[in-house]
């Protein structure tokens, strides 16, 4: 069983995926893995999300997790579908305690110091900084990281292929989350693979 730190270190960019059509699940996963991005966050925002997770985890090399996990029940459902990690937009005590009890690799969302302190109280120290660009971007994250030196982040929300490398220069950032690698609409496998190759080459100060 992987912990969330090891998941975050696998690739510089974690694609944030919204699967609308179950037929797209396998080709998207294959294209991303072929491009060097093997950590796939499938958001639980569509009716076919859990089924998509089951399909994508069968793709060799794919490490599949669930995003938009809002409560303990959703975490359990994602775990049953075979997820290796779980991402939430925020953090509640109930969700955090449940994840710790289940030894689940949870990456909870934080937006301020109080959120981080709650996570630390629950035994968590890896967080999704969300929605990154709307809450001050890299300057805000740098300020937060200077206070919580043991914490590592995955900023998500408004990250672009232009801004991602700047975030990854910060040693408190293990990876970034982004949706740009899978543009909306019917998947263009060649384009997804090309975007993934570009993103997988981003350098990280926090990961040798």
Curated annotation (Swiss-Prot):
Main location: cytoplasm
E.C. code: 4.1.2.14
Gene3D superfamilies tied to this protein: Aldolase class I (3.20.20.70)
Catalysed transformations (reactions): 2-dehydro-3-deoxy-6-phospho-D-gluconate = D-glyceraldehyde 3-phosphate + pyruvate
CDD domains associated with the record: KDPG_aldolase (cd00452)
Disulfide bond entries: none
Family matches, as InterPro entries: Aldlse_KDPG_KHG (IPR000887), Aldolase_TIM (IPR013785), KDPG/KHG_AS_1 (IPR031337), KDPG/KHG_AS_2 (IPR031338)
Keywords assigned: Carbohydrate metabolism, Cytoplasm, Lyase, Schiff base
Site (Plays a major role in determining the stereoselectivity): 156
Induction note: The eda gene is monocistronic and is transcribed from a single promoter. High-level expression of the gene can be attributed to very efficient translational initiation caused by the high quality of the ribosome-binding site and stability of the mRNA.
Pfam short name (any one): Aldolase
Pathway in which the depicted protein is active: Carbohydrate acid metabolism; 2-dehydro-3-deoxy-D-gluconate degradation; D-glyceraldehyde 3-phosphate and pyruvate from 2-dehydro-3-deoxy-D-gluconate: step 2/2
GO function terms (MF aspect): (R,S)-4-hydroxy-2-oxoglutarate aldolase activity; 2-dehydro-3-deoxy-phosphogluconate aldolase activity
Subunit structure: Homotrimer.
Annotated function: Involved in the degradation of glucose via the Entner-Doudoroff pathway. Catalyzes the reversible, stereospecific retro-aldol cleavage of 2-keto-3-deoxy-6-phosphogluconate (KDPG) to pyruvate and D-glyceraldehyde-3-phosphate.
Name of this protein: 2-dehydro-3-deoxy-phosphogluconate aldolase
Source organism of the structure: Zymomonas mobilis subsp. mobilis (strain ATCC 31821 / ZM4 / CP4)
Gene that specifies this protein: eda
């Amino acid at each position: 069983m992987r912990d969330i730190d090891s998941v975050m270190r696998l690739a510089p960019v974690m694609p944030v995926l919204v699967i609308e059509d179950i037929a797209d699940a396998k080709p998207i996963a294959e294209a991303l893995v072929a491009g060097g991005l093997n950590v796939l966050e499938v958001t639980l925002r569509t009716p076919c999300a859990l089924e998509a997770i089951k399909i994508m985890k069968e793709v060799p090399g794919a490490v599949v997790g669930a995003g938009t996990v809002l409560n303990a029940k959703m975490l359990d459902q994602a775990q049953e579908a075979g997820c290796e990690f779980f991402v939430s937009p925020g953090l509640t005590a109930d969700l955090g305690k449940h994840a710790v009890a289940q030894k689940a690799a949870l990456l909870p969302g934080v937006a301020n110091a109080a959120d981080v302190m709650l996570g630390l109280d629950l035994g968590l120290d890896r967080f999704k900084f969300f929605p990154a660009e709307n809450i001050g971007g890299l300057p805000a994250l740098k300020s937060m990281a200077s206070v919580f030196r043991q914490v590592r982040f995955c900023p998500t929300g408004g990250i672009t292929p232009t801004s991602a490398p700047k975030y990854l220069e910060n040693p408190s950032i293990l990876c970034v989350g982004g949706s740009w690698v899978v543009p909306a609409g019917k998947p263009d496998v060649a384009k997804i693979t090309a975007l993934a190759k570009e993103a997988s080459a981003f350098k990280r100060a926090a990961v040798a």
